[in-house]
């Protein structure tokens, strides 16, 4: 996203939409390539966790995309800058855990999952990202999921969440940026798929 804004000079909303489109490609590709190291059967067996987070993230993604289309460019840029700072802090401190069990149980866990999903869906939609930066720490810390499995579960949550945000953005006239920059989008998507393939293959070698 910063590259789209600073290096390529896209307006804030256009950059978010472009980033969302390319992230959707990456998530789809990564989900496939990771299946060798994390079987889809294992992902499917944790469907309740995925559903719990989706209950909030779908609403958050749709709502936040609506906000983004109404905000002025400068306002959206300030929101993006603040959220990127928050994500940086989460990335710095959010993965240091060896949790093996859920932090909460029963209705409390469900409520916390919906709330976390709502927040993550909104942030992901506003930044045009998949949300794994926040989903993985949430899955590890809140649900006690293994880090490798958390990566695949985050993709299972991200894909429907991104589709929801993408559908809302498609109603705005800025969505035409995808058609106007088709060659750019395709080249970035191709590179992203290649990177996702390398990452998926390397996952099996990482302890």
Regions found by a protein language model. Give the residues of each.
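Juxtamembrane transmembrane-helix boundary motif
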Residues: 2-7, 11-12, 31-125, 141-142, ...
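Transmembrane helix-bundle signature of multi-pass membrane transporters/permeases
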Residues: 16-27, 151-162
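Membrane-water interface of transmembrane alpha-helices
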Residues: 163-171
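Transmembrane helix boundary and interhelical junction motifs in multipass membrane proteins
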Residues: 1, 126-138
């Amino acid at each position: 996203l910063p590259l789209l804004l600073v290096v390529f000079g896209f307006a804030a909303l256009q950059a978010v939409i472009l980033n969302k489109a390319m992230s959707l490609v990456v998530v789809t590709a990564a989900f496939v390539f990771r299946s060798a190291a994390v079987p889809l059967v294992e992902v499917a067996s944790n469907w309740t966790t995925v559903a719990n987070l989706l209950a909030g993230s779908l609403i958050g993604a749709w709502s936040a995309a609506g906000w983004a289309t109404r905000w002025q460019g400068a306002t959206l840029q300030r929101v993006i800058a603040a959220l990127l700072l928050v994500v940086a802090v989460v990335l710095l401190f959010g993965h240091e855990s060896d949790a093996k069990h859920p932090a909460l149980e029963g209705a409390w866990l469900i409520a916390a999952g919906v709330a976390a999903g709502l927040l993550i869906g909104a942030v992901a939609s506003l930044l045009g990202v998949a949300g794994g930066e926040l989903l993985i720490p949430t899955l590890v810390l809140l649900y006690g999921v293994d880090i490798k499995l958390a990566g695949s579960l985050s993709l299972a949550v991200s894909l429907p969440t991104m589709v929801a945000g993408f559908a809302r953005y498609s109603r705005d006239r800025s969505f035409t940026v995808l058609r106007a920059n088709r060659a750019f989008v395709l080249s970035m998507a191709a590179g992203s798929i290649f990177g996702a393939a390398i990452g998926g293959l390397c996952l099996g070698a990482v302890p």
